[in-house]
Amino acid sequence: MKVALPKGVFDIFPYITDAKHMWRHTSLWHRVEDVIHEVCDLYGFSEIRTPVFEKSEVFLHVGEQSDIVKKEMYTFLDKKGRSLTLRPEGTAPIVRSFIDNPMSQREDNKFYYILPMFRYERQQSGRYRQHHQFGVEAIGVRHPLRDAEVLSLLWNFYSAIGLQYMQIQLNFLGGSATRKRYDQVLRGYFLQHLDSLSSLSKERFNTNLLRILDSKEPEDQEIIKSAPPILEYVSDEDRKYFDEILSALSALNIPYSINSRLVRGLDYYTDVVFEAITTFGGHSYALGGGGRYDGLIAASGGVATPACGFGVGLERVIQTLLAQGNLTLPSSHKLRLIPVEPEADSFCFVWAQHLRSLGIPTEVDWTHKKLKAALKTADTEKVTFVCPIGERELLSEQLTIKNMSLRQEFSGSKQEVEQRLLYEIQNTSL
């Protein structure tokens, strides 16, 4: 009996050829991940990897009234009855790790991660129950230029992978005094419209007032549009902090806009929040977001420590890159040896190992199909170089390398073709 994948998950696979599923091609993921490592290294961020599952209480500080905690977590009991949860987001586990490792803490801690997340999402396009997230967390420093630096890293990532039509949207939620003052104003406003709000927003009115601004329900939109903006109620100190972030973005020519309705879906955010928005194909949607969360570490049992960060869903990033035509399969510069006759098998086996020791990616076609069919397969699979080897090549000690991309070939002794292959791989962009 065939066993199918559960709903909401997918394989990242190396042999995909159809356009619809090309976003799942392993090589595309490698390319994006390589850019992440390069950009984060430029900014002095170090990779962190946390366990796939944590004690469930780790995620309660995300906000017990958040959709993630209430509806989307994969939570189970182990054999001793302890509640464990598959990681639904990246920040809370890193905060847990930071608190767990006090001897490893520095005054300024800069982490990044590329990890799978697990959420019981409703089935819809672009939403997956296992998805992959790139994120950074900067823990230990509170400074507007640190926030701007994190935003700069995010922007440089988008630029480096070739995303277009991007803009940063920002809002400022303020500290506890600003939030308390604004909460009173917002509660009074929504109370006037309570009967017209969606059932979800009526629930949030009593549990998480600010999240009403994040509602996607049609009946809430006109009411939200007229809600008083929080920036009218921030303190002078908060406004100065926010303005310094905006000035820094302008200095780096990073396009941004202020969205006074922007709040984040996780309850731990304070002060600056942001989303990276692309407008493409007649639609606008977020490709990442984050903000500052100065209260989360203390709420999680640690010493009060300022922090900020962001998360980016990689599935949507790769799909958008393909839609914009800015991501293609890279050439592997792979060499495939084709033993035309069984007598060439041993030679191919030994030479392939030598070629690999030189740094030339090499594989052997052991199918022993006819040469024409073997060449057609190599062409379909976008193998860059092939070398058919039979009795004639073994006797003459002359080998021919076919460049399948350029439809060219070159011949010579074993040492000569090795040198030519090294040159081609190091100096040719195919």
Curated annotation (Swiss-Prot):
Superkingdom classification of source: Bacteria
Location in or out of the cell: Cytoplasm
One Pfam family cited in the UniProt record for this chain: tRNA-synt_His
Cellular component GO terms held in the UniProt record: cytoplasm
UniProt keyword Repeat, yes or no: no
GO MF annotation terms: ATP binding; histidine-tRNA ligase activity
Stated name of the protein: Histidine--tRNA ligase
Organism, scientific name: Chlamydia caviae (strain ATCC VR-813 / DSM 19441 / 03DC25 / GPIC)
